[in-house]
Structure formats: structure tokens, C-alpha cells
Amino acid sequence: MSEIVAEWGGRIFYDGAHQAGLIAGGQFQDPLREGAAVLTGSAGKTFSGPQSGIIVWNDPALTEPITHAIFPVLAATHQVNRVAALAVSVAEMLAFGEVYLAQIVRNARALAAALDRRGIPVLGKPKGYTSTHQVIVDVRRFGGGNELAQRLATANIITNKNLIPEDRPEDWDSPGGLRLGTIEVTRLGMGEAEMEAIGDFIVRIVSGQDRPEAVVNDVVEFREPFQTLYYCFENGFPPNTVTATAQDRKDQR
């Protein structure tokens, strides 16, 4: 794409809001190395830092126009405390990101498989369900994404309604899909085994087997032991974490 766009004097600007952490953690391709001129992303989401934005580029010629567009055109000031928090997040990404993001993806695949085995259709099954932190499920026959997201929230399970293939644009407020993510549960030290339990909670509500009020106490009891944030300088890796780096795996081969 970059070669085609360059023929017409254009540049590719890559929106990596959801993928920024996956890119930094080596779980996703690097757009800048593949021809993108600018990469934008969220410092939250998969990057797990303070809520803010990130703009990255590797062409020195873009430095002046981009920085000028930010200040003074779009922003007059910034929060220094957020910059400090982002600096810590970047340092932790360098130290823990590869292992952290790999576990996020493993957990997402484990959760997808758990839901699939329990009769909830999961998009992307022929390709292993997902290569990111997200799992998309088709819940049209169970009441739709909006209704089920609200029912799950009553049981302290936070999901998001999501458009899926065959939905129409006007279905945005009542789509046929649900979007699930594994960022926070992974940061709390959960692994593939816990995804089985989470899958059970979700299916009990989605299938209509139980009312949310009958599940919420089970969710609270399940969540209670997980009170420590991992993949950070304070607490390091969760117990029994596989911490081999890409170089380690390359050396083993």
C-alpha cells in the first residue's frame, strides 16, 4: 500500500489505537517498518498506560509540521503528571511487554475457545479466533449485543456491543455482536485456566441459564483473590510465568 500511495505523493497514517501495545510487545506487525509514515495510538488499551494519545514517526522531515500542529494549533498545554506516568509505562513495556502481550493473546484465544465449546459462535474460528486481545462473538440468537452487554454488566462482567458481518450501519446501537478483551484480567495475573471460568460465567448469562443476579456473587468470589497488578516494576511477573524472550526462543531453535 505504501508503494502505491507514494506514487501519488501520499503517505500512510496508521491508526494503532487498539494495537499500540501489541506492536510494542512484538505481537503485531510494525507499521512504520512496513511503510507507514505516522503511527498514532492510545497510551491506554493494550499499552496499559495513562489515558492519552501517542504519535510516532521516523521521518525527521515530519517533526516540525506534526509538533506545530499539536502546539499551538490543537493543544495549548499538557499534563506533566501524565507524561511521568507514560514514561513509567514505556519503561515497563520495555521490561515486561513481550511476555505480557503474549499472555494477553493466549488468554484471548483460550477465552474464545471456551465460549465456542459452550455453544457461543465466535468470529474468526478458522484462523484461530484472534491474534489480538479481542474476541468477537455472535449473539444474535441470544438477544443481541446491546441487551447482553447490559445483562453481563449487572453481573460485573464488562463487555461492549459490536457490529458484526451482516449487521447494517443503522444497527450500531443494537448490533449482533459482543466484544470481549483480556487486557485487565491478564494484568491481574490470570491465565488460560481462568479463561475457562470466565467463559462459564458468560455462557450462564448469555444462554439464559441463569439471571445476572444469580451469577454476580460467583463473579465477585472468583475475582477476589486477584488483587495484584503484575507485569510492572513493583510486582514483576505473575508466579509460574514463562518469560522466554524472542531472542531466547531464537537461540533455542
Place the predicted regions along the sequence by residue:
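Hydrophobic alpha-helix feature that most strongly marks membrane-spanning transmembrane helices
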Residues: F71, A91, R109, D116, ...
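Conserved small-domain helix->loop->beta segment predominantly found in fold-type I
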Residues: V90, L101, V105-A149, T159-S174, ...
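Intrinsically disordered or highly flexible coil/loop and linker segments, enriched in small
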Residues: A75, Q79, V99, R117-P121, ...
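Short helix/loop capping segments that flank catalytic or ligand/cofactor-binding pockets
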Residues: L22, G49, N146, L188-G189
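Phosphate/diphosphate-binding loops
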Residues: A37-S52, G144, L148-L163
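PLP-dependent enzyme catalytic core of the Aspartate aminotransferase-like
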Residues: R106, D171-R253
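Short acidic (Asp/Glu) and glycine-rich catalytic loops that position anionic groups and cofactors
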Residues: T63-H68, V83-E92, K127-Q134, S174-T182, ...
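Conserved PLP-enzyme active-site core in the AAT-like
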Residues: M1-P121, V139, T182-I183
